[in-house]
Amino acid sequence: MANAAHRFTEYRKTMALLNILHYPDKRLHKVAKPVDKVDDRIRKLVADMAETMYAAPGIGLAATQVDVHERVIVIDVSEDKNELRAFINPEIIWSSDGKQVYEEGCLSVPGIYDEVERPDRVRVRALNEQGETFELDCEGLLAVCIQHEMDHLMGRVFVEYLSPLKQSRIKTKMKKLERAM
């Protein structure tokens, strides 16, 4: 994924931090549309999303979270934050029967963490920043992250996997936090 890192560097001079929407903002439930053409606008979006994700700090960000309703995700689960991956029009083409439980958090739900069960391995097909199709087998944290971010593209937030009681408590907490800001 050196291409994404290269593009990130190339656009660094013009990058902007984007505002991250917070749950329960209704715009987080909007389904993202496919990207028609991978062009400089999309590459700039990837760079801006990466800058925003690193600054937050986070390990993944979907365009939906920054109020851009197109199928674009950036992820970097590396310890050194030097393995940026961009996924344009991602789709899961295979998932294992095995499950894993990870404690998830989200930049759109700051301060909230809870366990979510997901397939432990997935294969993703997407476009890179040059508009070329690639496939990637994911496991562990990368598999969790790609599924979490793809949920955002479908208008779903991880807390919606939790019980109705937990969801209600989180909504109340987030609304109080928003009023305090």
From Swiss-Prot:
Classification via InterPro entries: Peptide_deformylase (IPR023635), Peptide_deformylase_sf (IPR036821)
Q: Which cofactor does it need?
A: Fe(2+)
Could you tell me what the cofactor note in this record states? Binds 1 Fe(2+) ion.
Active site (catalytic residues)? 149
EC number(s)?
Answer: 3.5.1.88
What biological process terms from GO does the record include?
co-translational protein modification; translation
Q: Which reaction does it catalyse?
A: N-terminal N-formyl-L-methionyl-[peptide] + H2O = N-terminal L-methionyl-[peptide] + formate
Which positions does UniProt annotate for Fe cation binding?
106, 148, 152
Molecular function per GO: metal ion binding; peptide deformylase activity
Q: From the record, what ranges are coiled-coil?
A: none
Regions that span the bilayer: none
Instruction: Family membership, please give it.
Output: Belongs to the polypeptide deformylase family.
> What else does UniProt say about it?
The submitted crystal structure binds Zn(+) rather than Fe(2+).
Q: What does this protein do?
A: Removes the formyl group from the N-terminal Met of newly synthesized proteins. Requires at least a dipeptide for an efficient rate of reaction. N-terminal L-methionine is a prerequisite for activity but the enzyme has broad specificity at other positions.
For this entry, the protein name equals Peptide deformylase 1
Q: What is the lineage of its organism?
A: Bacteria, Pseudomonadati, Pseudomonadota, Betaproteobacteria, Burkholderiales
The gene for this chain is def1
